[in-house]
Amino acid sequence: MFKWLMSSLCGTKNPASLEEVYEPIMGGKNPATMLRLQSALAAVNALLPATLTIEDVISSADNTRRLVKAQTLARTYQACQHNIECLSRHRASSDNPNLNAVVATHMANAKRLSDTCLAALMHLYLSVGAVDATTDTMVDHAIRMTAENSVVMADVAVLEKTLGLEPQPSVMAHDLLALESSVYNSGNSVPVNDYPAEDVESTQSVHSPLLSKRPSNTEVVCSSIPVKSNLKSKPRRKPSLVAA
Protein backbone atom coordinates (compact mmCIF):
# COMPACT_ATOMS: atom_id res chain seq x y z
CA MET A 1 0.00 0.00 0.00
CA PHE A 2 2.81 2.39 0.93
CA LYS A 3 4.69 1.54 -2.29
CA TRP A 4 1.59 2.23 -4.37
CA LEU A 5 1.05 5.54 -2.58
CA MET A 6 4.64 6.68 -3.15
CA SER A 7 4.56 5.67 -6.81
CA SER A 8 1.32 7.59 -7.27
CA LEU A 9 2.73 10.72 -5.65
CA CYS A 10 5.98 10.56 -7.63
CA GLY A 11 4.23 9.83 -10.90
CA THR A 12 6.07 6.56 -11.51
CA LYS A 13 4.41 3.40 -12.74
CA ASN A 14 5.31 -0.23 -12.88
CA PRO A 15 7.38 -0.97 -16.03
CA ALA A 16 5.20 -4.00 -16.67
CA SER A 17 2.14 -1.75 -16.97
CA LEU A 18 3.82 0.37 -19.67
CA GLU A 19 3.81 -2.46 -22.20
CA GLU A 20 1.51 -2.16 -25.18
CA VAL A 21 -1.72 -4.08 -24.77
CA TYR A 22 -3.90 -4.88 -27.76
CA GLU A 23 -7.39 -6.27 -27.43
CA PRO A 24 -8.04 -9.57 -29.19
CA ILE A 25 -10.70 -8.88 -31.79
CA MET A 26 -10.39 -11.94 -34.01
CA GLY A 27 -12.53 -14.12 -31.73
CA GLY A 28 -15.44 -11.72 -31.49
CA LYS A 29 -16.47 -8.26 -32.58
CA ASN A 30 -16.85 -5.90 -29.67
CA PRO A 31 -18.92 -2.87 -30.77
CA ALA A 32 -16.75 -0.41 -28.82
CA THR A 33 -13.54 -1.88 -30.24
CA MET A 34 -14.89 -1.89 -33.78
CA LEU A 35 -15.94 1.74 -33.38
CA ARG A 36 -12.43 2.72 -32.32
CA LEU A 37 -10.97 0.82 -35.26
CA GLN A 38 -13.31 2.55 -37.68
CA SER A 39 -12.38 5.93 -36.21
CA ALA A 40 -8.69 5.15 -36.55
CA LEU A 41 -9.13 3.95 -40.13
CA ALA A 42 -11.03 7.11 -41.00
CA ALA A 43 -8.16 9.27 -39.71
CA VAL A 44 -5.51 7.22 -41.50
CA ASN A 45 -7.37 6.67 -44.78
CA ALA A 46 -7.76 10.42 -45.19
CA LEU A 47 -4.02 10.57 -45.89
CA LEU A 48 -3.56 7.36 -47.89
CA PRO A 49 -3.90 6.90 -51.65
CA ALA A 50 -6.16 3.85 -51.22
CA THR A 51 -8.29 2.99 -48.21
CA LEU A 52 -7.58 0.17 -45.80
CA THR A 53 -10.29 -2.08 -44.45
CA ILE A 54 -10.82 -3.53 -41.01
CA GLU A 55 -10.14 -7.01 -42.41
CA ASP A 56 -6.71 -5.82 -43.53
CA VAL A 57 -5.95 -4.54 -40.05
CA ILE A 58 -7.25 -7.40 -37.90
CA SER A 59 -5.54 -10.03 -40.06
CA SER A 60 -2.51 -9.90 -37.78
CA ALA A 61 -1.33 -8.21 -34.61
CA ASP A 62 1.44 -6.44 -36.53
CA ASN A 63 -1.10 -4.68 -38.71
CA THR A 64 -3.00 -3.60 -35.60
CA ARG A 65 0.17 -2.09 -34.15
CA ARG A 66 0.79 -0.32 -37.44
CA LEU A 67 -2.71 1.10 -37.36
CA VAL A 68 -2.17 2.47 -33.84
CA LYS A 69 1.07 4.14 -34.91
CA ALA A 70 -0.52 5.40 -38.11
CA GLN A 71 -3.42 6.90 -36.19
CA THR A 72 -0.99 8.86 -34.03
CA LEU A 73 0.93 10.00 -37.10
CA ALA A 74 -2.29 10.99 -38.85
CA ARG A 75 -3.44 13.09 -35.92
CA THR A 76 -0.02 14.73 -35.68
CA TYR A 77 -0.10 15.45 -39.40
CA GLN A 78 -3.56 17.01 -39.15
CA ALA A 79 -2.42 19.14 -36.20
CA CYS A 80 0.56 20.35 -38.24
CA GLN A 81 -1.75 21.17 -41.13
CA HIS A 82 -3.93 23.24 -38.82
CA ASN A 83 -0.92 25.06 -37.37
CA ILE A 84 0.44 25.80 -40.84
CA GLU A 85 -2.93 27.17 -41.91
CA CYS A 86 -3.04 29.48 -38.89
CA LEU A 87 0.57 30.61 -39.29
CA SER A 88 0.06 31.36 -42.97
CA ARG A 89 -2.44 34.07 -42.05
CA HIS A 90 0.30 36.07 -40.37
CA ARG A 91 1.35 39.16 -42.30
CA ALA A 92 4.96 40.19 -41.83
CA SER A 93 5.45 43.81 -40.82
CA SER A 94 8.25 46.03 -39.61
CA ASP A 95 6.46 46.79 -36.34
CA ASN A 96 7.53 43.54 -34.67
CA PRO A 97 10.41 41.86 -36.53
CA ASN A 98 11.00 39.36 -33.72
CA LEU A 99 7.50 37.96 -34.20
CA ASN A 100 8.13 37.50 -37.91
CA ALA A 101 11.20 35.37 -37.19
CA VAL A 102 9.31 33.24 -34.66
CA VAL A 103 6.44 32.64 -37.09
CA ALA A 104 8.85 31.68 -39.86
CA THR A 105 10.64 29.22 -37.57
CA HIS A 106 7.40 27.60 -36.43
CA MET A 107 6.22 27.38 -40.03
CA ALA A 108 9.39 25.57 -41.11
CA ASN A 109 9.22 23.16 -38.17
CA ALA A 110 5.55 22.40 -38.81
CA LYS A 111 6.20 21.68 -42.48
CA ARG A 112 9.12 19.40 -41.69
CA LEU A 113 7.14 17.51 -39.05
CA SER A 114 4.17 17.07 -41.37
CA ASP A 115 6.45 15.76 -44.13
CA THR A 116 8.04 13.29 -41.72
CA CYS A 117 4.64 12.04 -40.55
CA LEU A 118 3.50 11.62 -44.13
CA ALA A 119 6.65 9.69 -45.03
CA ALA A 120 6.22 7.40 -42.04
CA LEU A 121 2.59 6.82 -42.99
CA MET A 122 3.64 5.80 -46.48
CA HIS A 123 6.19 3.40 -45.01
CA LEU A 124 3.59 1.80 -42.73
CA TYR A 125 1.12 1.69 -45.58
CA LEU A 126 3.55 -0.22 -47.79
CA SER A 127 4.42 -2.62 -44.98
CA VAL A 128 0.82 -3.80 -44.69
CA GLY A 129 1.03 -5.28 -48.19
CA ALA A 130 -2.74 -5.43 -48.66
CA VAL A 131 -2.89 -2.96 -51.55
CA ASP A 132 -1.49 -3.63 -55.01
CA ALA A 133 0.49 -0.48 -55.67
CA THR A 134 4.07 0.43 -56.47
CA THR A 135 6.41 2.65 -54.51
CA ASP A 136 6.46 5.26 -57.25
CA THR A 137 2.67 5.49 -57.09
CA MET A 138 2.85 6.02 -53.35
CA VAL A 139 5.32 8.86 -53.72
CA ASP A 140 3.29 10.50 -56.51
CA HIS A 141 0.12 10.33 -54.45
CA ALA A 142 1.88 11.68 -51.38
CA ILE A 143 3.29 14.66 -53.27
CA ARG A 144 -0.08 15.30 -54.93
CA MET A 145 -1.91 15.18 -51.60
CA THR A 146 0.54 17.59 -50.07
CA ALA A 147 0.24 19.98 -53.01
CA GLU A 148 -3.57 19.87 -52.84
CA ASN A 149 -3.40 20.83 -49.17
CA SER A 150 -1.37 23.94 -50.09
CA VAL A 151 1.65 22.68 -48.16
CA VAL A 152 5.10 23.20 -49.63
CA MET A 153 7.18 20.08 -49.07
CA ALA A 154 10.23 21.37 -47.25
CA ASP A 155 12.05 18.05 -47.50
CA VAL A 156 10.99 15.68 -50.27
CA ALA A 157 14.13 13.65 -49.56
CA VAL A 158 12.45 12.37 -46.39
CA LEU A 159 10.04 10.39 -48.54
CA GLU A 160 12.82 9.03 -50.73
CA LYS A 161 14.93 8.03 -47.76
CA THR A 162 12.04 6.43 -45.87
CA LEU A 163 10.81 4.47 -48.88
CA GLY A 164 14.33 3.45 -49.91
CA LEU A 165 14.35 5.36 -53.18
CA GLU A 166 17.45 6.70 -54.84
CA PRO A 167 17.11 10.00 -56.74
CA GLN A 168 17.79 9.69 -60.46
CA PRO A 169 18.99 13.04 -61.83
CA SER A 170 18.25 13.78 -65.45
CA VAL A 171 21.82 14.99 -66.05
CA MET A 172 24.76 12.94 -64.90
CA ALA A 173 27.52 14.51 -62.88
CA HIS A 174 30.25 14.13 -65.49
CA ASP A 175 27.98 15.56 -68.20
CA LEU A 176 27.25 18.58 -66.03
CA LEU A 177 30.96 19.07 -65.35
CA ALA A 178 31.78 18.91 -69.05
CA LEU A 179 29.03 21.40 -69.83
CA GLU A 180 30.26 23.84 -67.19
CA SER A 181 33.85 23.57 -68.42
CA SER A 182 32.82 24.24 -72.02
CA VAL A 183 30.80 27.28 -70.98
CA TYR A 184 33.72 28.55 -68.91
CA ASN A 185 36.18 28.15 -71.78
CA SER A 186 33.88 29.86 -74.26
CA GLY A 187 33.31 32.73 -71.85
CA ASN A 188 36.97 33.26 -71.01
CA SER A 189 38.42 32.82 -74.51
CA VAL A 190 39.58 36.09 -76.03
CA PRO A 191 39.98 36.50 -79.79
CA VAL A 192 43.46 37.09 -81.14
CA ASN A 193 42.37 40.36 -82.70
CA ASP A 194 41.68 41.88 -79.27
CA TYR A 195 45.26 41.56 -78.05
CA PRO A 196 47.37 44.74 -78.38
CA ALA A 197 49.99 44.29 -81.09
CA GLU A 198 51.94 47.53 -80.87
CA ASP A 199 55.28 46.04 -79.77
CA VAL A 200 54.65 42.41 -80.62
CA GLU A 201 56.63 40.80 -83.38
CA SER A 202 54.49 37.65 -83.64
CA THR A 203 50.97 36.74 -82.58
CA GLN A 204 50.05 33.94 -80.17
CA SER A 205 49.32 30.57 -81.68
CA VAL A 206 45.66 29.68 -82.01
CA HIS A 207 46.39 26.14 -80.79
CA SER A 208 47.22 27.37 -77.28
CA PRO A 209 45.42 25.42 -74.54
CA LEU A 210 44.27 28.72 -73.05
CA LEU A 211 42.08 29.37 -76.05
CA SER A 212 39.11 27.40 -77.22
CA LYS A 213 39.34 25.43 -80.42
CA ARG A 214 38.31 27.37 -83.50
CA PRO A 215 37.31 26.22 -86.99
CA SER A 216 39.92 25.99 -89.72
CA ASN A 217 38.61 29.00 -91.61
CA THR A 218 39.11 31.16 -88.53
CA GLU A 219 42.73 30.07 -88.30
CA VAL A 220 43.35 31.15 -91.88
CA VAL A 221 41.86 34.54 -91.22
CA CYS A 222 43.95 35.00 -88.09
CA SER A 223 47.17 34.00 -89.84
CA SER A 224 46.62 36.59 -92.58
CA ILE A 225 46.36 39.51 -90.16
CA PRO A 226 49.32 41.89 -90.59
CA VAL A 227 51.47 42.43 -87.54
CA LYS A 228 52.33 45.97 -86.57
CA SER A 229 55.92 46.90 -85.76
CA ASN A 230 57.75 49.96 -84.42
CA LEU A 231 60.44 49.66 -87.11
CA LYS A 232 59.75 52.13 -89.87
CA SER A 233 60.27 50.74 -93.32
CA LYS A 234 62.52 52.78 -95.63
CA PRO A 235 60.89 54.27 -98.72
CA ARG A 236 61.70 52.47 -101.91
CA ARG A 237 63.63 54.31 -104.56
CA LYS A 238 62.06 54.90 -107.89
CA PRO A 239 63.52 52.88 -110.76
CA SER A 240 64.25 56.05 -112.68
CA LEU A 241 66.52 57.38 -109.91
CA VAL A 242 68.37 54.08 -109.63
CA ALA A 243 68.95 53.96 -113.36
CA ALA A 244 70.35 57.46 -113.32
From Swiss-Prot:
A lipid is attached at C10 (S-palmitoyl cysteine). Belongs to the herpesviridae UL51 family. InterPro entries: Herpes_UL51 (IPR007625). Phosphorylated. The gene is 8. Coiled coil: none annotated. It comes from the Viruses. The keyword Glycosyltransferase does not apply. GO terms for cellular component: host cell Golgi apparatus; viral tegument. Oligomerizes. Interacts with ORF55; this interaction mediates ORF55 incorporation to virions. Its main location: virion. Keywords: Host cytoplasm, Host Golgi apparatus, Lipoprotein, Palmitate, Phosphoprotein, Virion, Virion tegument. It comes from Equine herpesvirus 4 (strain 1942). It is found in: Virion tegument; Host cytoplasm; Host Golgi apparatus. Pfam families: Herpes_UL51. This is Tegument protein UL51 homolog. Plays several roles during the time course of infection, including egress of virus particles from the perinuclear space and secondary envelopment of cytoplasmic capsids that bud into specific trans-Golgi network (TGN)-derived membranes. The lineage of its organism: Viruses, Duplodnaviria, Heunggongvirae, Peploviricota, Herviviricetes.
